[in-house]
Amino acid sequence: MRRAAGARELLDGPVPPADLAATLRDIERLDAWLGGHALSLARVRRAARQVPADRLLRVIDVGGGGGGFARRVARWARRAGRRVEIVLVDRGAGTAALARRACAAYPEIRVISADAATLPLRRGCADVVHAALTLHHLEPETAVAALGEMARVARGRVVVNDLARTRIALGLVWMATRLLAMHAISRHDGPLSVRRSYAPQELAELFRTAGLPRVRVRRYPVLARLVAEAA
């Protein structure tokens, strides 16, 4: 399946606040249904083992949307007795505002509105820099810039979790957006997100071009996911 380069998702344009909120909820439901958050959290937990237990664990979630994954990390850290600081970055001011409200009960989460390609964060400030369902929104040149910024602010791992561009994934996402009675934007954008996603070799090449040559890409066909990780 060829990548749908240049195709535009509705969520990347202006969206009324109520529709935006509904679509972000749909994304979190889809992540729960397909297990995307679990794959990412496993990487955070693995990275945490490399950080002394008495030291603050710092996580950056790039393109963090409504904050579902950030909250999941915070809940895990509380259960594990780990001190954690999570910075959620999203370029949409409306999305960031919704995330702040959704994360209000989590003082360990800070939300900022910024572009992935120009992160307003200092070099080497995070143990894990994570992006889920984000890279497929970007064309290759911008994706490389975003990965370069993620590498700059990471002192540990860079993790990218995105949809697999396969017919199985396309069918799973199409079915999920219908069976779970998702918003019209989600029914449009979900399958298109699959078609816009990068194949494993394409994703690995983006990492290498961004200065992250030691990248490992794992496929999870049943979950419709790819996870790329570099340290």
Label each residue range with its predicted role:
Residues 196, 200-231:
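Conserved Class I S-adenosyl-L-methionine
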Residues 154-163:
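Conserved beta-strand signature within the Rossmann-like core of class I S-adenosyl-L-methionine
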Residues 130:
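A conserved beta-strand element that flanks and buttresses the S-adenosyl-L-methionine
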Residues 138-149:
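A short, conserved alpha-helix within the catalytic core of class I
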Residues 1-15:
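N-terminal auxiliary segments of SAM/dcSAM-dependent transferases
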Residues 163-210:
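C-terminal alpha-helical "lid/dimerization" subdomain adjacent to the S-adenosyl-L-methionine
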Residues 60-62, 66-118:
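Class I SAM-dependent methyltransferase SAM/SAH-binding core
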Residues 12, 17-43, 47-48:
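Class I SAM-dependent methyltransferase Rossmann-like catalytic core
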